[in-house]
């Protein structure tokens, strides 16, 4: 790769970004506070663009990148990127799910243990000087059937972290077959069996037109033994209104959400506010602000994952 090729970085990245990319012959223009108008104006000067989830790489932006050779997504999801147009323009797309998969797996285990052991309620009560052991009696993860919906980098990482808990792990992935042939701690099942047996549903699918609000009232109601839901994928794949209905009816024991349909909480509609408040007030829900993959270690590791992939481009 020729030296001094310029790339534009428009979102917050770990401080190692300059050193890591300089090591593969790329100079970073680090502009995390850049406006979209500025981005469009200066993009023609760059061969690469590095983004996170807040930047929409759409037709308007792509067509301005006359010398653009690649887009790097610092993370896993690419729902904010016009993937088809990039391919049509022969612009490479790189993401970095390898960089934060361990973080997501660990976060999921933490959320699941909190649900099973009612730690949100127990913590709240003790802080209020209530000492109620019986009402906070929890369940063991051992022998539970944990269903992983989508077995990519994140789903497989969650399965790896569950190995030591003596639970039964089943997985369903519509677009993969034989993905458990070399591992003995996960059973690959068809959707019918998955819905019949899963007690815990952990969602690990990308947001696409097909998966948008896939998990609605009817879909969730088709599960026969479902007790807990964990979503660390994309908020829009799960209908929170329908989740609220099922949860408040007592048909679920708990839900842990790292992602929401609308994560800009100051823009909620009145209907969304009612739904969110009902879920926030529920004793058996746990929330985190889209941080499952957001650890100090993953923050730096993502730089190295992207750099390694980008270094293989033939300029």
Residue positions per predicted region:
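Rossmann-like dinucleotide/phosphate-binding beta-alpha-beta segment
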Residues: 23-24, 134-225
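An N-terminal-biased, well-structured beta-alpha scaffold segment characteristic
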Residues: 1-94, 196, 216-221
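Residue-level detector of alpha-helix initiation sites
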Residues: 56, 77-80, 99-100, 145, ...
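Short, conserved active-site loop motifs that form the nucleotide-linked donor/cofactor pocket
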Residues: 26, 91, 186, 284-286
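Phosphate-binding beta-alpha-beta segment of Rossmann-like dinucleotide-binding domains, i.e.
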Residues: 91, 97-145, 157-160, 164
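Beta-strand-loop-alpha-helix segment that lines the small-molecule cofactor/substrate pocket
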Residues: 62, 66-69, 81-93, 203, ...
């Amino acid at each position: 790769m020729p030296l001094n090729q310029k790339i534009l970085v428009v979102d917050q990245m770990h401080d190692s970004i300059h050193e890591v990319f300089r090591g593969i012959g790329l100079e970073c223009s680090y502009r995390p506070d850049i406006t979209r108008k500025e981005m469009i104006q200066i993009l023609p000067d760059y061969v690469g663009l590095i983004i996170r989830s807040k930047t929409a790489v759409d037709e308007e932006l792509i067509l301005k990148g006359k010398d653009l050779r690649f887009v790097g997504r610092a993370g896993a999801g690419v729902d904010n990127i016009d993937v088809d147009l990039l391919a049509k323009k022969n612009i490479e797309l790189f993401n970095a799910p390898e960089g934060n998969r361990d973080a997501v797996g660990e976060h999921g285990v933490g959320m699941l243990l909190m649900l099973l052991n009612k730690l949100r309620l127990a913590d709240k009560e003790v802080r209020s000087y209530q000492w109620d052991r019986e009402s906070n009696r929890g369940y063991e993860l051992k022998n539970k059937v944990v269903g992983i919906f989508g077995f990519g980098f994140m789903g497989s990482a969650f399965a790896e972290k569950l190995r030591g808990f003596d639970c039964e792990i089943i997985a369903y992935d519509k677009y993969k077959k034989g993905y458990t042939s070399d591992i003995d701690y996960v059973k690959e099942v068809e959707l019918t069996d998955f819905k019949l047996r899963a007690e815990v549903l952990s969602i690990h699918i990308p947001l696409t037109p097909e998966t948008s609000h896939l998990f609605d009232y009817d879909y969730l109601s088709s599960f026969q033994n479902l007790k807990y839901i964990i979503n660390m994928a994309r908020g829009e794949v799960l209908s929170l209104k329908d989740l609220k209905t099922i949860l408040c009816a007592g048909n679920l024991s708990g839900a842990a959400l790292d992602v929401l349909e609308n994560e800009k909480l100051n823009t909620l509609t009145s209907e969304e506010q009612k739904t969110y408040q009902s879920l926030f007030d529920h004793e058996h829900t746990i929330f985190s602000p889209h941080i499952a993959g957001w650890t100090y270690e993953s923050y730096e590791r993502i730089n190295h994952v992207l750099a390694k992939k980008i270094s293989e481009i033939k300029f």
